[in-house]
Amino acid sequence: MNIELKLLNKEIIKEVPEYGTEGSAAVDLRACLSEAEFLSPGECKLIGTGIAINIANPNYAAMILPRSGLGHKKGLVLGNGTGLIDSDYQGELMVSCFNRSQEVIEIEPMMRFAQLVVVPVVQAKFDIVEEFSQRTIRSAGGFGHTGV
């Protein structure tokens, strides 16, 4: 699958997103900053990546995810949990960064700070009904219904 990638900041050409290994599911995104940004404990900031993508196929979307090591070791996670990039969005990829630690986190220019994965999407057609056509064993059992 080919996705068009637009460089919005010429500095990013030095570090164009690419897969790290043959088995990598995601590409790293870099912080397109002219100087370091500092996140205080509990603070959330939007950081640009300097790139835009054109997926152009409604059967796919992209998801921005945190980098495992940064979340676990430093406390840098996404402020919105997951960033969903629709196939028709063509603006700059922005990352909502949240500091869940008790220490100030420094985000350096061109630092790998999030990752992007392309995923298949199915657009469902919703049929409005009075009752479902079949009842499942779980039915309306909600959070923790299966034991957790």
From Swiss-Prot:
What Pfam families does its record include?
A: dUTPase (PF00692)
Q: Which CDD domains match?
A: trimeric_dUTPase
Q: Give the keywords, sorted.
A: Hydrolase, Magnesium, Metal-binding, Nucleotide metabolism
Class of the enzyme per the UniProt entry, highest EC level:
hydrolase
Q: Which cofactor does it need?
A: Mg(2+)
The pathway noted for it is: Pyrimidine metabolism; dUMP biosynthesis; dUMP from dCTP (dUTP route): step 2/2
InterPro entries listed in its UniProt record: dUTPase (IPR008181), dUTPase-like (IPR029054), dUTPase-like_sf (IPR036157), dUTPase_trimeric (IPR033704)
Q: Where does substrate bind?
A: 67-69, 80, 84-86, 94
Question: What biological function has been recorded for the protein in this entry?
Answer: This enzyme is involved in nucleotide metabolism: it produces dUMP, the immediate precursor of thymidine nucleotides and it decreases the intracellular concentration of dUTP so that uracil cannot be incorporated into DNA.
Q: What is this protein called?
A: Deoxyuridine 5'-triphosphate nucleotidohydrolase
